[in-house]
Amino acid sequence: MNYSFTEKKRIRKSFAKRENVLEVPFLLATQIDSYAKFLQLENAFDKRTDDGLQAAFNSIFPIVSHNGYARLEFVYYTLGEPLFDIPECQLRGITYAAPLRARIRLVILDKEASKPTVKEVRENEVYMGEIPLMTPSGSFVINGTERVIVSQLHRSPGVFFEHDKGKTHSSGKLLFSARIIPYRGSWLDFEFDPKDLLYFRIDRRRKMPVTILLKALGYNNEQILDIFYDKETFYLSSNGVQTDLVAGRLKGETAKVDILDKEGNVLVAKGKRITAKNIRDITNAGLTRLDVEQESLLGKALAADLIDSETGEVLASANDEITEELLAKFDINGVKEITTLYINELDQGAYISNTLRTDETAGRQAARVAIYRMMRPGEPPTEEAVEQLFNRLFFSEDSYDLSRVGRMKFNTRTYEQKLSEAQQNSWYGRLLNETFAGAADKGGYVLSVEDIVASIATLVELRNGHGEVDDIDHLGNRRVRSVGELTENQFRSGLARVERAVKERLNQAESENLMPHDLINAKPVSAAIKEFFGSSQLSQFMDQTNPLSEVTHKRRVSALGPGGLTRERAGFEVRDVHPTHYGRVCPIETPEGPNIGLINSLSVYARTNDYGFLETPYRRVIDGKVTEEIDYLSAIEEGRYVIAQANADLDSDGNLIGDLVTCREKGETIMATPDRVQYMDVATGQVVSVAASLIPFLEHDDANRALMGANMQRQAVPCLRPEKPMVGTGIERSVAVDSATAIVARRGGVVEYVDANRVVIRVHDDEATAGEVGVDIYNLVKFTRSNQSTNINQRPAVKAGDVLQRGDLVADGASTDLGELALGQNMTIAFMPWNGYNYEDSILISEKVAADDRYTSIHIEELNVVARDTKLGAEDITRDIPNLSERMQNRLDESGIVYIGAEVEAGDVLVGKVTPKGETQLTPEEKLLRAIFGEKASDVKDTSLRMPTGMSGTVIDVQVFTREGIQRDKRAQSIIDSELKRYRLDLNDQLRIFDNDAFDRIERMIVGQKANGGPMKLAKGSEITTEYLAGLPSRHDWFDIRLTDEDLAKQLELIKLSLQQKREEADELYEIKKKKLTQGDELQPGVQKMVKVFIAIKRRLQAGDKMAGRHGNKGVVSRILPVEDMPYMADGRPVDIVLNPLGVPSRMNIGQILEVHLGWAAKGIGERIDRMLKERRKAGELREFLNKLYNGSGKKEDLDSLTDEEIIELASNLRKGASFASPVFDGAKESEIREMLNLAYPSEDPEVEKLGFNDSKTQITLYDGRSGEAFDRKVTVGVMHYLKLHHLVDEKMHARSTGPYSLVTQQPLGGKAQFGGQRFGEMEVWALEAYGAAYTLQEMLTVKSDDVNGRTKMYENIVKGEHKIDAGMPESFNVLVKEIRSLGLDIDLERY
């Protein structure tokens, strides 16, 4: 087995029973691929597919003028280079975007020509605004902040059939309905009412009989009935009435008369029910007609108009009900044959026929007018307007788009469904197979008449009892709209606005000699894009607390947002877990609260297909043998197969073992024989999301707690020194690498140079492009603020001389340890009560944990100040501030900005700023004083940027931005100079490394080669030696050597050119950087200068901080106990954390207990390895012990491939504890945990005996730190990976004496942000009343709250030392009086 450079250092022992068939895919692929498809930058102009930007342009262009003589055509688009890179955009608060330019052609036709002739063509590039670019990690930088566009899970376009589940009508009758949902355009609904009449509505407007729509589509009554009904023909004669015998219609009917065969034998007696046997007898007897009673004709509907063949008189119209009068009329007129609609109560309802009777519209035009009146009430229906509206509703490509997905869904649901034999022979089968044959193939992205009729027919057939309704929560009916598609829709809507404006101007294009760029104003496009990225519900501020929260945010799918659901209307069904979520959407990870079930996370292996439906991978199974072939199946396809689970038992050849295998079929769990199985899951963790798959022993946790565990891992604050979890699941490395927090090598090579800011790698010759200088430089991110103010800091994980392969770890980031996700710390945990300090999930923690900075985290706050141009004059950033103490002034430089490295506390001035004050009338005394002392300071007021309350820290960076045309202060200039100096050094270092690398390659290439001549009189044909090269005055003289080998000479020339190019590039880059830094900054209107101060705040663990494990076991630190008081083990080691054992049973998250036991084994193994290393044992002994660890059970590791040095390095990395991986649903078994405990704590070891283990080695004797006595019972002790969450008490603690008051009520404001007071509510008042504390209550309700005069008086009394209270009238009482007066009731107050 090949281990990467980093994996060798710390191999994670996996308990997985099955080989990994499919690697975890790139976790951000959905976002990155979607946006790449939108931009199509890789494709040449003519190779671009009809997606993304290209599709948006194609859908709007060509734009034709109203008179038809001018049109604008789209040729292609290009994206320029962004002006600033990502860090610069973040610093300056601007959007990381590239300019979009479209090549547009204006074609003008000749008006005089008899046929369309092109008179003139004008073409040029038109600026279409800026398109935000995606960062390599799948986010966007909008106005300086990182944002994520969350994918949306919305209802797929197409046709859907459903019923109301009997909720509408009191009888519980099912009312069926259908809805045609386009991607863009009007919705068309069909619905049955309780009387079984069929109606339609457009865009949820007023309902109308469906026959109006059918008439509007061009059908008359007879044609409508012909489509939706089978016919019955009755033959009238003097002998009675006969009808054609259709065997299928007789079953279950009652014989109205005796049915006789030709000999007169009774086949079915009158009044008897006709059975299947009777039907066979009738068929065998060869009967073709049946006698019926004349009364049975009554109430039947005519299928067509009955016309007297002689006179041409219409005797009865289609759909007329047959009555006694009509029959008499037929008799008089000698009608011998009538055709009626075949209707029965069971499976051929009279719905359309009855609906037609309620519809009074006379024909096509009248029907269209009725629809017009419904859509545009109050507007006069002119013929042109009526036609235009009707055609635009469903048949115009401009206003209606079913989309590719919609068409596919529509066809599969209507035209391509499987019909039963009875349906094949009915009107429905004839309609689909004959009348509408081929309709599916010619269906475009607009509706056709056939589509509408087929939808109505399918709904009627449903009501007739044939077929199934759709499940709208099935993932085959919901699709994912990712970032590319969402942006395309916004771009298209912006272009549509442009189109309207352009059409107006196109008529003047020729006369005014306009060019395309004169016609197109790109403002609406950029406004639409800006609005979407800046304020759409799906454009969210990126959750950047730690790498996992970043990855999870980008993998989120939301059912909310424009075109989606709303929280209030979403019912239980939509939020619930559906069988089709399996392997596509995580059943565990979703928020608690109002969004539960509406916001989900993609499962680890899930991806979207071309149509936007989620699919998940399965291994193909053929004849009970599992193959290596992998197919991705969507929810619709999955329903057709029998699928085994990933943990099904296989033999060595991959055959399924056992008589029955647990499988899934159509969402149900079944037991199937191996030969029926068609697919098998690829991995046990396929069901869950990334966050849930990071929880070890997930299978032993209750789902509610697992949900909390998955959510709380995203809130873990990166610790100062990240520590890998001893018990993980094996997916930690994927998260760390894919989140781009840890840096991996782009190409293999040797590490040339390492410092805290940069890693330089000389690329291997075979990976470097020929003639190119192969050096990769990785600049690390240092102490950068994340969106949640946590610290992003990368640390090199390699040393000079290390040999790396592509994909090896180069640097660790926040919350990563050796390339693995490390959200918390491994803590020694004891489950026991301790003096009530772990009551209600409280956590008792050792002082040593805080002292060792195990949970210390650094938070970086950014504070801004702007100097504006005000009406009274410009604000000034200066050191000269009135009444500023010397201590504070000493921290500011001459420009008035705080020094880097200064330690600042609440209230300290960070940036001095003064604002001009309005001229006030001075008293004579003030005038005199001013005349004497020249006191001018009172003209300005101090508006400096001060450190906010409750915050203290160290200034780590200052940035100054100055508007173009305003002179920079010294500080701004020095920042620019130091930045340029650093950049120049960087470039010089790069050039030096490139040079060294190039000349090393040249030396290896030319030493030993023959030369035709060269510097220092090199003779022709002489061999080039190292000494000769060293003797040349400069290495650049090597290029003057003339080699005999022409290929080598060419390579030498290429390297020379490459170096020259690098030098020119470096100079060019320096000039660009200089220009960027020295040009003025783009600031908001009226802002002259802006200063940003970055402050690093160190937060130690303290009482009140929230902590949690990975199993939803959360709590608040109640006390930090001195280490000497903590419970300790027999060997004197104290535990780190004491948890309440009662927090486990009722919560049913037993995973934490198993984690603690396995963690305890990991720690014990680490201690044994540590002892062996201290005793300087031989590498062979270490190898033997590690073999027991890695190759006892579970997945086997190839330790023989490691050298002795690598074994020793591996062992030294395991000193603090072994690393275990217990994958979800395939984790360590109890026996394996026991095996590891026995390996860690062998019974023969005297040290182990001293600890006082129980038989299973899961509990030990602990001693009370205060008394030294042993606790009565043995205690479960072990190691758990414990996290500190982002709910820090430092950020919540707040106190106020006086502060701002509300304007109306004059009560103190609420909340820390407003520096508000504590709410003293109704229940608190009751408490004081209960105690009879009248005076306390009085001051609470008056002077401490809203008695304005009283609180001023109170202040005076305290200053004077008079401790008495003068309570007056609360202002809120005056508010109440005013409110009552506003109701027209006057209240007068009387004094007593």
Swiss-Prot record:
For this protein, the record's Gene3D superfamilies field holds: 2.40.50.100, 2.40.50.150, 3.90.1100.10, DNA-directed RNA polymerase, beta subunit, external 1 domain, DNA-directed RNA polymerase, subunit 2, domain 6, RNA polymerase alpha subunit dimerisation domain, RNA polymerase Rpb2, domain 2
Q: What are the alphabetically sorted keywords of the record?
A: DNA-directed RNA polymerase, Nucleotidyltransferase, Transcription, Transferase
Q: Which InterPro entries match?
A: DNA-dir_RNA_pol_bsu_ext_1_sf (IPR042107), DNA-dir_RNA_pol_bsu_external_1 (IPR019462), DNA-dir_RNA_pol_su2 (IPR015712), DNA-dir_RNAP_su2_dom (IPR007120), DNA-dir_RNAP_su2_hyb_sf (IPR037033), RNA_pol_bsu_bac (IPR010243), RNA_pol_bsu_CS (IPR007121), RNA_pol_bsu_protrusion (IPR007644)
Instruction: Give the Gene Ontology MF terms in alphabetical order.
Output: DNA binding; DNA-directed RNA polymerase activity; ribonucleoside binding
Report the SS bond pairs. Answer: none
GO biological process terms, semicolon-separated: DNA-templated transcription
GO CC, one annotated term: DNA-directed RNA polymerase complex
**Would the keyword Transferase be found if you checked this record's keyword annotation?**
yes
Describe the reaction catalysed, as an equation: RNA(n) + a ribonucleoside 5'-triphosphate = RNA(n+1) + diphosphate
Enzyme Commission designation: 2.7.7.6
- Entry-linked Pfam families: RNA_pol_Rpb2_1 (PF04563), RNA_pol_Rpb2_2 (PF04561), RNA_pol_Rpb2_3 (PF04565), RNA_pol_Rpb2_45 (PF10385), RNA_pol_Rpb2_6 (PF00562), RNA_pol_Rpb2_7 (PF04560)
Superkingdom of the source species: Bacteria
Chain's role: DNA-dependent RNA polymerase catalyzes the transcription of DNA into RNA using the four ribonucleoside triphosphates as substrates.
Query: Quaternary form?
Result: The RNAP catalytic core consists of 2 alpha, 1 beta, 1 beta' and 1 omega subunit. When a sigma factor is associated with the core the holoenzyme is formed, which can initiate transcription.
Q: Which HAMAP family match?
A: RNApol_bact_RpoB
The similarity comment for this entry is:
Belongs to the RNA polymerase beta chain family.
Protein name (database record): DNA-directed RNA polymerase subunit beta
Q: Which organism is it from?
A: Neisseria gonorrhoeae (strain NCCP11945)
Q: Which gene encodes it?
A: rpoB
